[in-house]
Amino acid sequence: MQLSVWTYEGPPHIGAMRIATAMRDVHYVLHAPQGDTYADLLFTMIERRDRRPPVTYTTFQARDLGGDTADLLQSAARAAYERFQPQAMLVGASCTAELIQDDPGGLAQALRLPIPVIPLELPAYQRKENWGASETFYRIVRALAASSADGSPRHERKAGARPVCNLLGPTALGFRHRDDLAEVTRQVVELGIEINVVAPWNATPADLARLPQADFNIVLYPEIALTAAQWLNRQFGQPYTKTIPIGVGATRDFIREVAGLAGVDAEPVLSRAESRLPWYSRSVDSTYLTGKRVFIFGDATHAVAAARVATQELGFEVVGLGTYAREFAREIREAAALYGIEPLITDDYLQVEARVSELRPELVLGTQMERHIAKRLGIPCAVISSPTHVQDFPARYSPQMGFEGANVLFDTWVHPLMMGLEEHLLGMFREDHEFADHAPSHLGAAPAAPPQQPQLRVVETVTSTELAWASDAERELTKIPFFVRGKARRNTERFARERNVNLITLETLYDAKAHFGR
């Protein structure tokens, strides 16, 4: 066990809650102590949902452990059915209740309720949130889809009938899942494909029973839906997509893949496709972004997609790539090999911070924790993956997928760099007479009183390696853009050490610049 102030994923029962909360007419009975009810706040406070998750907690206390906690669970399950009248019930235990070993699923099934009761066995001390969501969705699909079909391969589509697909993966508390779903739905409809079921988002148990009626499945988030899609493929012969439409290039590949599975022509849709990212990334005001060093960390789906967009569409250089999801370590390693870098597979945020400090990138793309890390290190950052905070569940339309999602990516990733450059330019020209506080105002007001000039610092700064910076060299260093200032300082100090120069003057700084600029 590791004590930490931050975790990238919660226990697996949080993943189960994400599935139950995303669906309709489903109720989750969770065998848990009173302290585990904190999870409701993830949905009401962070995601800002207008209703509580459909979860009933047994909320046993310490004094109950000497009695029959199994009876508590059965009473809670019976009361939940009578009050909420769900079409299906999920039953499981939290990480704390798992230690009691009460077998919640078996106890609930013994009640003989007139609805499907789906037991969830989620090992809290071996697995985490995304796996819990994937396993829960798989168990629900297997229980409900299998009960409505004889297991035979799907029937071939009649001539002239529109192709039909399912959209799998969007959940509650997912990073931009609501808007991604709207964007992908629009693209699928433009291809002339009918959508049979979207799951788990807003799906009912009756909807999941109709999953076998589709011709193929679109997997939007492999962390959630891949296991279920693989089972549907084996059981009903439904193929599934493997391309994630994040970025212009990936979206075009996705449209071609979907069109191939549906047997339709993708070119009319591709010819009408519009995204401002390709032109913006080539435009004059963006050329200074070329070659910027970027560090990427998040869930595997978003991290791998972000690396492709960064290198192929924005001209960045990926210097770090990693994930906290060990189940998808293979995908991250394969992607890292393409960029010739060492992957970082860890759920320890301290290791991530150490890697960022070591690489000193010019942009960090990550989760909420990487936002904190980058802020401490003074590096621009954009959030690309869960876990996130409340500001990453915006009221506005802000997808990550599709052509509109590519526009959002450009704004989200590039604006931190552009605003940083703007601040640098203001600082660089602050001493010019045009920007002086006592200059005449165009508003006709009296000029401001001349400000007190601070005394120039003449004391030389000494680093831990006994290198001294002259005050004029230090001032000149501040005129270098912030996103390369650290590199300029390191190169200059390295240049000075190699030549046994103890005092870095303005001339030393210029000599170092000329040396490394060759």
From Swiss-Prot:
Active-site residue list: 285 (proton donor)
Keyword Nucleotide-binding: yes
E.C. numbers: 1.3.7.7
GO MF annotations in UniProt: 4 iron, 4 sulfur cluster binding; ATP binding; metal ion binding; oxidoreductase activity, acting on iron-sulfur proteins as donors; oxidoreductase activity, acting on the CH-CH group of donors, iron-sulfur protein as acceptor
Function: Component of the dark-operative protochlorophyllide reductase (DPOR) that uses Mg-ATP and reduced ferredoxin to reduce ring D of protochlorophyllide (Pchlide) to form chlorophyllide a (Chlide). This reaction is light-independent. The NB-protein (BchN-BchB) is the catalytic component of the complex.
Protein name per the record: Light-independent protochlorophyllide reductase subunit B
Cofactor: [4Fe-4S] cluster
UniProt keyword list: 4Fe-4S, ATP-binding, Bacteriochlorophyll biosynthesis, Chlorophyll biosynthesis, Iron, Iron-sulfur, Metal-binding, Nucleotide-binding, Oxidoreductase, Photosynthesis
The protein's annotated pathway: Porphyrin-containing compound metabolism; bacteriochlorophyll biosynthesis (light-independent)
Catalytic activity annotation: chlorophyllide a + oxidized 2[4Fe-4S]-[ferredoxin] + 2 ADP + 2 phosphate = protochlorophyllide a + reduced 2[4Fe-4S]-[ferredoxin] + 2 ATP + 2 H2O
EC class: oxidoreductase
GO biological process: light-independent bacteriochlorophyll biosynthetic process; photosynthesis, dark reaction
Note accompanying the cofactor annotation: Binds 1 [4Fe-4S] cluster per heterodimer. The cluster is bound at the heterodimer interface by residues from both subunits.
Assembly with partners or alone: Protochlorophyllide reductase is composed of three subunits; BchL, BchN and BchB. Forms a heterotetramer of two BchB and two BchN subunits.
Residues that, per the record, bind substrate: 420-421
Entry similarity comment: Belongs to the ChlB/BchB/BchZ family.
UniProt cross-references to HAMAP family, sorted A to Z: ChlB_BchB
Amino acids binding [4Fe-4S] cluster: 36
SUPFAM superfamilies the UniProt entry points to: Helical backbone' metal receptor (SSF53807)
Residues annotated as transmembrane: none
InterPro entries, per database record: ChlB/BchB/BchZ, LI-POR_suB-like_C, Nase/OxRdtase_comp1, P-CP_red_C, Protochl_reductB, Protochlorophyllide_Rdtase
